Amino acid sequence: IVYVLAQVAGCILGAWLAHAMFELPILQASTHVRAGPAQMLSEGVATFALLFAILFVSRWKAEAVPPAVALVITAGYWWTASTSFANPAISIARAMSDTFAGVRPADVPGFIAGQIAGALLAWAASVALLPKDRQT
């Protein structure tokens, strides 16, 4: 639970820092509507892609995980309707940013539901498809 709280706090502080860098009010609440099945599906797909990439790449070359994460998140920005948050902590923090990147607080539970579904599917796919031991 400490790890989860640290992630949420770090994401919120990051949003506030971004506001300060762009001379925006530090404390905001998003009004950017991101509701509906397409957004939830997009977050599920983005989270699946991110976690499966981590699990896949780490089986062969652990040091390649950071660039793989960067590539999946960058690509997900372009190929998902939600712009690929892929992390509940980010979804919570983006509810505190009334910018294009923001998400209305009422829409956050749908994002998190999609992310949980994507995470569970990525885990199941990794168990079914990937070797159990690290490959060299």
Task: Indicate where each model-derived feature is located.
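Membrane-interface helix-loop junctions and terminal tails of multi-pass membrane proteins
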Residues: I1-T136
